[in-house]
UniProtKB/Swiss-Prot annotation:
It comes from Ceratitis capitata (Mediterranean fruit fly). The chain crosses the membrane at residues 12-32, 68-88. This is Ribonuclease kappa-B. Inhibited by Zn(2+) and Hg(2+), while it is unaffected by Ca(2+). One of its GO terms (cellular component) is membrane. It is an enzyme of class 3 (hydrolase).
Length: 95
């Protein structure tokens, strides 16, 4: 079933591949607690102790990593849809 044209399906392929690469890497950097990404954590500004901060930061890092990996999986679905549409469009032009 044809949903989109050849240009849009190719654009979807390219953007999906880039999104998968970027989100997997961001998830990896969040998972290893990269200091460069600390500004992106949804944590409070003030804590009573250092241990409380470390616990909240580790939890937020892990949650952001999982969110990135879930978004990468959604991009895989978009990649599959775009690849199927590219295949359908290439068969239609070959005949």
């Amino acid at each position: 079933m044809k949903i989109c044209g050849p240009k849009l399906s190719l654009c979807g392929l390219i953007i999906s591949v880039w999104g998968i690469i970027q989100l997997v890497l961001m998830g990896l950097f969040f998972y290893i607690n990269s200091v460069a990404l600390i500004e992106d954590l949804p944590i409070d500004e003030e804590f009573n102790s250092v241990e409380e901060f470390y616990t909240a930061a580790t939890s937020a890092y892990n949650q952001n990593a999982y969110n990135c990996w879930i978004a990468a999986c959604i991009y895989v679905l978009t990649l599959l849809l775009s690849a199927q549409q590219f295949y359908v469009n290439s068969r239609a032009t070959a005949n």
